[in-house]
C-alpha cells in the first residue's frame, strides 16, 4: 500500500466512526479542530470519497475502499467469521412465501443441512457493521440456485451459515430483493422470533461463518 493509500485508509476509518454527525461534533470526537476537519472533508469530497452535506457521510466509493481494506485484513488474519449487530424489523411477509417454495426449500436442505422454517428474520444493521455486510457481497458463499416452475423464474440466492444469538441458521442474500442493503434476512430451522423471544426493535447478534 502506497503512502497516499495508507493516509487515505486512516482518514476514512476515522470518518467512518463519526458518520451521521455534524462536522462540529465530529471534530470533537476526532480531537480535531473544525478547520482541520473541514479541510480534510473538502479534499476527500473532491476525490469522491465523502458526500457533500452538513454531516459526515462516506460515498459508495469511500465505503468500497474500506471494504477492500477489510477484505485484505480478514484474509491476512485468516478470520473464519464476522459479527453483525442490528435490530429486528418487520418485513412484508415475502420471506415466508419464497422459503416455502419447493425449489428453495429443497436446495436449503441439501446445501445448508436443515429444513427451513417458512419465513425469515429481518435485521436492520447498525451503521458501523455495514463494511462487514458489504464484504459479504464479494464472497462466494453457498449458492442456492434459481429455478423455474413453468410460470415464473426465481433468482439465485447466496447464503452464509450463521448463528443468531447462538441459534444455527443462515444469512440469505437473494439476487433480487426489495430490502435496502442495511437489512439482512436470516433463515433457520425454527421461527427465530419465537425461539429467541424477539420483537421489533430488539438487538440481535449474528455470527456469519465465512
UniProtKB/Swiss-Prot annotation:
It catalyses: riboflavin + CTP = CDP + FMN + H(+). Mg(2+) binds at residues 120, 122. One of its GO terms (biological process) is FMN biosynthetic process. One of its GO terms (molecular function) is nucleotide binding. CDP binds at residues 91-96, 190-193. It holds the Pfam family CTP-dep_RFKase. Gene3D superfamilies: Riboflavin kinase-like (2.40.30.30), Winged helix-like DNA-binding domain superfamily/Winged helix DNA-binding domain (1.10.10.10). Its EC number is 2.7.1.161. Pathway: Cofactor biosynthesis; FMN biosynthesis; FMN from riboflavin (CTP route): step 1/1. Binds 1 Mg(2+) ion per subunit. Residues 82-210 are annotated as: Riboflavin kinase. It comes from the Archaea. Its cofactor is Mg(2+). Keywords: Flavoprotein, FMN, Kinase, Magnesium, Metal-binding, Nucleotide-binding, Transferase. Residues 1-81 are annotated as: H-T-H motif-like. FMN binds at residues 177, 185. Belongs to the archaeal riboflavin kinase family. Catalyzes the CTP-dependent phosphorylation of riboflavin (vitamin B2) to form flavin mononucleotide (FMN). This is Riboflavin kinase. It comes from Pyrobaculum arsenaticum (strain DSM 13514 / JCM 11321 / PZ6).
Amino acid at each position: 500500500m502506497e503512502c497516499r493509500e495508507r493516509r487515505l485508509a486512516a482518514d476514512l476509518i476515522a470518518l467512518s466512526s463519526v458518520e451521521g454527525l455534524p462536522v462540529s461534533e465530529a471534530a470533537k470526537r476526532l480531537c480535531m479542530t473544525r478547520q482541520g476537519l473541514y479541510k480534510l472533508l473538502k479534499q476527500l469530497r473532491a476525490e469522491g470519497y465523502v458526500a457533500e452535506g452538513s454531516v459526515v457521510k462516506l460515498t459508495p466509493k469511500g465505503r468500497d475502499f474500506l471494504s477492500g481494506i477489510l477484505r485484505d485484513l480478514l484474509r491476512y488474519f485468516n478470520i473464519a467469521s464476522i459479527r453483525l449487530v442490528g435490530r429486528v424489523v418487520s418485513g412484508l411477509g415475502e420471506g415466508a412465501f419464497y422459503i416455502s417454495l419447493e425449489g428453495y426449500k429443497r436446495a436449503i436442505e441439501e446445501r445448508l443441512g436443515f429444513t427451513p422454517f417458512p419465513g425469515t428474520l429481518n435485521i436492520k444493521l447498525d451503521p458501523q457493521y455495514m463494511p462487514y455486510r458489504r464484504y459479504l457481497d464479494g464472497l462466494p458463499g453457498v449458492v442456492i440456485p434459481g429455478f423455474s416452475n413453468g410460470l415464473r423464474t426465481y433468482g439465485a440466492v447466496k447464503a452464509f451459515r450463521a448463528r443468531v444469538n447462538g441459534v444455527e441458521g443462515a444469512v440469505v442474500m437473494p439476487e433480487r430483493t426489495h430490502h435496502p442493503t442495511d437489512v439482512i434476512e436470516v433463515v433457520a430451522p425454527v421461527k427465530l422470533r419465537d425461539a429467541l423471544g424477539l420483537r421489533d426493535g430488539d438487538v440481535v447478534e449474528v455470527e456469519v461463518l465465512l
